[in-house]
């Protein structure tokens, strides 16, 4: 697996005259799979994405501004270019979910979605059904692949949600389910993305609606590059070393 070091934000609008199939191709003609990661604030979405990309865990992050990352991965003999779109936390109001248009465009843009909740936050679990329904409404006429991820499995002493409830709900919604500890286990994180990529078929991608393809035209806010991620990882590691030394 090789991480592509040119981090950006959501895919550029396809060139004039390009076809739906062209929009599904990444660098070197490889099939491109676009994944949006959504969920409530504080559930570990950014940590999940960075863990998948770098195999590293960084405990502290700045509030997410919506970054997109790209890597290559080999799945069943095929090399895929994967774009993973991190998103800000979703809020809930009396009238339901609060999803701004930028988030809606991210979801429409995606070929698949990861819905993340934390076993330490029951409200994040309660969001799953509404969020899944919202995702499917933004993809009418198709069954978008979705994986539900229960994060922070290592924090059993503050658990508010039994992971079995997440499994049952995911099964009811027709989604795959993974219980993970982003801080302690990379393999489970990788498996969740691996399975999701397998569920995205070339036929499904090529049948994207014109509306879905137009959502590729999204402003490109500045996002961190690999050097920035490495810098933050070193800072987090240095902070841990200082803490141990001072004890």
From Swiss-Prot:
Give positions of region: Disordered: 204-229
Q: Per the similarity annotation, which family is this?
A: Belongs to the small GTPase superfamily. Ras family.
Residue numbers spanned by region Small GTPase-like: 28-245
List its EC numbers.
Answer: 3.6.5.2
Tell me the gene name: Rasl11b
**GO annotation, biological process:** negative regulation of transforming growth factor beta receptor signaling pathway
Stretches that traverse the bilayer: none
Which key words tag this protein in UniProt?
Answer: GTP-binding, Hydrolase, Nucleotide-binding
What SUPFAM superfamilies does the database record attribute to this sequence? P-loop containing nucleoside triphosphate hydrolases
Q: Where does GTP bind?
A: 39-46, 86-93, 151-154
Q: What class of enzyme is it?
A: hydrolase
Indicate yes or no for the key word Nucleotide-binding. Answer: yes
Task: Tell me the superkingdom of the source.
Answer: Eukaryota
Protein name according to UniProt = Ras-like protein family member 11B
Q: What is the lineage of its organism?
A: Eukaryota, Metazoa, Chordata, Craniata, Vertebrata
């Amino acid at each position: 697996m090789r991480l592509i070091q040119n981090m950006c934000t959501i895919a550029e609008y396809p060139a004039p005259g390009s076809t739906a199939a062209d929009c599904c191709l990444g660098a070197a003609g490889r099939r491109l799979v676009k994944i949006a990661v959504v969920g409530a604030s504080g559930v570990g979405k950014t940590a999940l994405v960075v863990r998948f990309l770098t195999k590293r865990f960084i405990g502290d992050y700045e509030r997410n501004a919506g970054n997109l990352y790209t890597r290559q991965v080999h799945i069943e003999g095929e090399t895929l270019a994967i774009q993973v779109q991190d998103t800000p936390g979703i809020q809930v109001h009396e009238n339901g979910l609060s999803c701004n248009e930028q988030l809606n465009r991210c979801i429409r843009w995606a070929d698949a979605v990861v819905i993340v909740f934390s076993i330490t936050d029951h409200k994040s679990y309660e969001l799953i059904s509404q969020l899944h329904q919202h995702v499917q409404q933004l993809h009418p006429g198709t069954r978008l692949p979705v994986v539900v991820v229960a994060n922070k499995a290592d924090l059993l002493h503050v658990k508010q949600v039994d992971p079995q409830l997440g499994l049952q709900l995911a099964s009811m919604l027709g989604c795959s389910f993974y219980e993970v500890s982003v801080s302690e286990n990379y393999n489970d994180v990788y498996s969740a993305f691996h399975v999701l990529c397998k569920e995205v078929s070339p036929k499904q991608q090529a049948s994207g609606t014109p509306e879905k393809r137009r959502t590729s035209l999204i402003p490109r806010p500045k996002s961190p590059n690999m050097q920035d991620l490495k810098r933050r990882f070193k800072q987090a590691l240095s902070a841990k070393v200082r803490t141990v030394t001072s004890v």
